[in-house]
Amino acid sequence: MATKAVCVLKGDGPVQGIIHFEQKANGPVVVKGRITGLVEGKHGFHVHEFGDNTQGCTSAGPHFNPLSKKHGGPQDEERHVGDLGNVTAGADGVANVSIEDSLISLSGANSIIGRTMVVHEKPDDLGKGGNEESTKTGNAGSRLACGVIGIAQ
């Protein structure tokens, strides 16, 4: 079983970063990292279904959702497995990521290994936006940067 994973985020613009994932036994996954080049504020942060970046971040498909649920926030019962909420960039354009999540995993049915991590243009409304798009994407807008999550040492 993989206990560590890493993802290098890249996009067409200035946004880039490195995200580390670590899981002990059947515990939560600890997600830590740094993303630079962002506009100040909140940005949706999701694991998407496919590890396919052949056409940039668009070929990563929808949010990773093996349980066929509606989009939600990381604390919600009704959420995609890949819904990790938002990262927040300061005035310097840097988001320091520190998330602990019990739904994603580095093994088994909810494994995120080989899938794509995406940082979005806009804040994720956590499924509370009152329209259909909110229940799918959280109205998080375009995909600024992405990368495939791979097994790490």
Curated annotation (Swiss-Prot):
PTM section of the record: Palmitoylation helps nuclear targeting and decreases catalytic activity.
GO biological process terms on file: action potential initiation; anterograde axonal transport; apoptotic process; auditory receptor cell stereocilium organization; determination of adult lifespan; ectopic germ cell programmed cell death; embryo implantation; gene expression
Catalysed transformations (reactions): 2 superoxide + 2 H(+) = H2O2 + O2
Cofactor(s) annotated in UniProt: Cu cation; Zn(2+)
Residues annotated to bind Zn(2+): H63, H71, H80, D83
PTM-bearing positions, type N6-acetyllysine: K122, K136
Disulfide bonds: C57-C146
Enzyme class: oxidoreductase
Phosphoserine: residues carrying this PTM: S98, S102, S105, S107
EC number, UniProt record: 1.15.1.1
Modified residues (N-acetylalanine): A2
Residues at which Cu cation binds: H46, H48, H63, H120
One cellular component (GO) term of this entry: extracellular space
Cofactor remark from the record: Binds 1 copper ion per subunit.
Residues with lipidation of kind S-palmitoyl cysteine: C7
SUPFAM superfamilies: Cu,Zn superoxide dismutase-like
Subcellular location: Cytoplasm; Nucleus
Tagged with keyword Metal-binding: yes
Family in the record: Belongs to the Cu-Zn superoxide dismutase family.
Xref: PANTHER family: SUPEROXIDE DISMUTASE CU-ZN -RELATED (PTHR10003)
Assembly and interaction partners: Homodimer; non-disulfide-linked. Heterodimer with SOD1. The heterodimer CCS:SOD1 interacts with SLC31A1; this heterotrimer is Cu(1+)-mediated and its maintenance is regulated through SOD1 activation.
Protein name per Swiss-Prot or TrEMBL: Superoxide dismutase [Cu-Zn]
UniProt source species: Cavia porcellus
Lineage, highest ranks first: Eukaryota, Metazoa, Chordata, Craniata, Vertebrata
